[in-house]
Amino acid sequence: SSAASMCIRDSIMYNILDGAPPTDKIVYGTTNYVNGDTPIPKMLSQTLQQQGTFFKEVNASVVGHYAGVNTLLTGNYMFTQGLRNKPLTPTIFEYLRRLTGEKATKTWFIGNGIGNSIPLLDYSTHSDYGAQYGANFLAPIVTFGNSGDKHLKNAKVYHPEEELDPMYKMKYFLDNVWYSQGSALPNIGNTEEEKLEIKQFVRDMFQKKDSGSIAFPPISDSGDLQTIGYACEVLKRFKPTLTVIYLSNVDGCHGNFSSYLRSLHRADHGVGHLWDFIQNQVPEMSGNTTMIVAPEHGRNDDPNGPFGSSFLP
């Protein structure tokens, strides 16, 4: 896209930004005759740029991958912190829960997968905050994917008064083993009622998946779009005060340029669907929800390579 004075001439992200689809034959959509030859229809009658505030510039420092998401969630640049470490400064989840007393099921971090240390960002190691103020983390394409089908789908939801006693005995045994090794077992503070509610949600999602009734966008052919669909289900069920959704497919800064465009186009479609779902399917959140859309961090200027995974579609 090219921009001048807030006016975008062409855009493949026409739910978020103003501008019509490019007239050039760019292969970024779904497939009819040639890979990506059919743009995904627009979801919103009015772009998010028109409905909200468009920030043209951002002051960025360490913005790559984990460090970038860490910075977004904590408001602090992580110059020396690498992967496989939880944030050193409190996350927005912790600030919300500690300062307002919000319960755990009102705070969610939904990620597209469990790689790149993303699950570590649900709370920090700060001594004044930490796990007890963290967010519930969900990686839906893992939880409800092949691994979930194998290990969780047919798991029993135990009656809290009649059947949980032997389960608690096992839990306490395992907890004590953890404590005996000198570590505290992290706990974000879901009450027993909240835990049961989450278990029932997981069970319901497997049923909805089998019946084809998950709130997916009209096009859901990527991990990002499927993640958006499950995020809609979380919003519908729990009406969270704060939800962060991480879409990783757009993180293709050194890969196939055509695939990069497709991921951007699909992210736009998913964000449009998410906003439409909030306004029309979750009355408790319609009209009183703020959505902040942060872009991916750009890519190099290399074209598609002639060989291997970078070959033009």
Regions found by a protein language model. Give the residues of each.
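Substrate-binding rim/cap in mid-to-C-terminal beta-strand-loop elements of soluble/periplasmic
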Residues: 67-75, 308-313
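Active-site His/acidic residue clusters
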Residues: 204-215, 226-273, 277
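Short, structured active-site-proximal loop/turn typified by the sulfatase FGly-forming signature C/S-X-P-X-R
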Residues: 10-64, 108
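Loop/turn elements at helix/coil->beta-strand transitions in domains of secreted/extracellular proteins
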Residues: 49-55, 101-107, 237-243, 285-290
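Metal-dependent active-site segment of extracytoplasmic phospho-/sulfohydrolases and closely related
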Residues: 1, 267-308
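Acidic, His- and aromatic-enriched active-site or binding-groove loops in soluble protein domains
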Residues: 78-93, 125-165
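Short, small-residue-biased leader/transition segments that mark boundaries at the very start
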Residues: 3-8
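Extended, charge-rich helix/loop segments that form flexible
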Residues: 150-223
